[in-house]
Amino acid sequence: VSLLGGGIVPCASALSPKAKLVELKVKSPEKDFPIRNVWVWTPAVPADQVKLLPVVYMLHGWPGSPNGMIAGVVAPLAKAFAHGAAPFIAVFPDGNALTHADSEWADSDDGRAMIETWLTKYVIKAVEAGNIRSRHDRAILGFSMGGYGAGIIALHHPNLYGQVITLAGYFVIDDLTNAFGYAPTHAAKAAYQTPTTFLKVANQVRWFLGESSQDYTELIRGQAAAWGKKLKSVKASYTESVESGGHSYIFVSNEIPKVTAWLKWAPMKPATPAPSASAIPTNSLRPTPSPTA
């Protein structure tokens, strides 16, 4: 099934396209969740333009779920697009885990959760099946733990993501439930999950670093500025942003207008067909918004 190649149903009037939220179930090579959920929000654009839109993958925090991110960003995105911002498709994967609840959006050292592999090898193929985007038309965004996840995944895969947005993210190890394992393998896994290990490739990606002036979370406070200094040392392109809202999706919502203005996309080109991936679309009912991270 090609979701983006034709996944928006034209309404009665071709002049009045409507936004659409669809849930996919995408297979994952892991024990915790062999099938994981992904929500895909397509903005109100003509059906023939959907397959040409850029795609932004949006990662939630912990504890949390896609619901919180959807509740925080869809309304400000729709408003920004209505006022002329370049539209894109927003994708909300579920990065939760069972064995190691604080997943850090990683492949756990024991392989029980394979979230990074799932996101980069399975979700992209499922969501973009009608037109696999280039890195210039694909970005990754995250809040809190999702901000860490967005940053480290972009550093691991600069060939996949041309832009990364971290909102209240952090750039240090915060492995609360031992997703990165125990001795003797922990040291190597921890190094792989440490952003500074990959600082030399950080200049291959554009960075948006957002942090609330009212966020007093010890792990978060000052992380954007500290990472910005490291990015400057390797001549990476980055923007720092400070907004109100504390450590919450209110802050995320406040950042969205800046994010949409900051993003840069490649000129639109005709879609290149690609093999469809294994994804099962379900009813396009909006999930109940969650106020948690």
What are these regions (language model features)?
Residues 1-293:
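Non-catalytic cap/lid and distal C-terminal segments of serine-dependent acyl enzymes
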